[in-house]
Amino acid sequence: MREEIKKLIEISRHFGKDKDYVVAGGGNTSFKNNEYLWVKASGSNLDGMKEEDFVQLERSKIQRVLNKSYTTDAIEREIEVKKDLLKCAVYPEKNTRPSVETLLHEIMDQDYVVHLHPTIINGLLCSKNSEKKVKELFNEEVLYLGYIDPGYSSAIAVEKALQEFNNKHGKPPRAIFLEH
């Protein structure tokens, strides 16, 4: 097993075992190098992750999914995107589905990405004036986005917002908050 995947398993289990970070095994993690992205398979729980619980995908194919023109119908688009992501798998015979947030992991510059739903943060993001509160707590160090449907829509919106943030601040945000 690659050292990077051992580290990814360790990171996944660390956050997965702490119920302050995840609810019912939710959230997802990934590692990427120049060629491949390993992302948590749908239906896997972070606290018990093993090597086979990650889907290895070809990044060049994921980029084609990101750049493809899809229908404007949100439901049809997500069905098409999920089918296209399955075609990115290095080992399709494993019959594992990549996380619906795979594209979000791909657009991040970081090698390791941890996407969680901590209860306390969910409470904050579901509250009135959540954007104002996030800015009060974290200043300009984080990126805040209003509600966006998960999957393709959120990846495209976050990618655009990240570019704007980087242009304004000259560096990436320390964290990204997506409203619920």
Where are the predicted features?
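Glycine-rich flexible loops
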Residues: 1-180
